[in-house]
Amino acid sequence: FDGLGGVLTGPFTAHPKIDPDTGDWHSFSTELKSGSVSYSVLSKGELTFYQEIDQAKPSSAFVHDGFLTDHCAVFPDLSLRFDAGQSFKEHASAFYYDSDYMMRFGVLHRQEGSDATVRWFDADMHGHIWHTVNGWEEVDADGATELVLVAPVFTSYPSNVPIHSPQEPHAHLYKFRFNLDSGALVDKRCLLQHFYERPSINTDWLGKQTRYAYLLDEEGSGGIMGSGVLKYDLLSEQAIASFDYGEYRGGEALFVPRDNAVEEDDGYLIELLTSDKDSALLVLDAKTMTEIARLTLPQRVPYGVHGCWLNSEQLQSLQA
């Protein structure tokens, strides 16, 4: 593991945001010892920016994911908190959900560099976010710039953090809209009541206005991984199509763009499916949500989440 010359002393984020225009990696990570959040930018493997951001104490338990837009880097400050002192109490955990702590978003202007200060945008609700869908900027009818953030939000969470298990509460898909100048919450709406999580998008649209999100159905699975995937239109706010995994369970339907694709949904969804008996690699047409191929693997693969796709050019660059 690379600590980048000792600058990164804590954990690195599970979900760096890669700017599709520059290839730079933007990451937010939680430093549990200090309670701070670190924001780092890597360009071609070199650390080009690093900043530590103090949090209210007790600190947010996790910053597992964040947002990147054309001009902003955004991280959530969440109602799931971390307090090591809690773990010394009988049957207690260092993690606890504080419904009195309102969720907010820390917004940094990317162009300000080392002079950037965090602006806090209040979400007007308590909540916890594991994974984000996307964020972008829009100009409203009056010419004001709005910051749009979309993510599944949990409004409760047990202290034993039972992620990917039947004890995990349900998340609901929310869209937040803020005035970027004032930080005021313009609109907040729940798009889906059904439990969808671990979203996927065409990352060529990361930070841009995104129409399509691919959401893992965790309600139909009884909380054990995902039972299928939903294609959802974020602009019309309507479900388009879904694909059911049947007796299998999946971890994340990863979007892979087709070569020379023009349209946002021109590509594939790749999913690793597992049952009690075997495992299979599933390939769906992301435009039609129909099955293209299914390859039964020679050995059952245990349940897992998250993955990445490397094309032949990227693989060759790693081998160079």
Question: Where do the PLM segments sit?
Answer:
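Beta-propeller domains
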Residues: 1-320
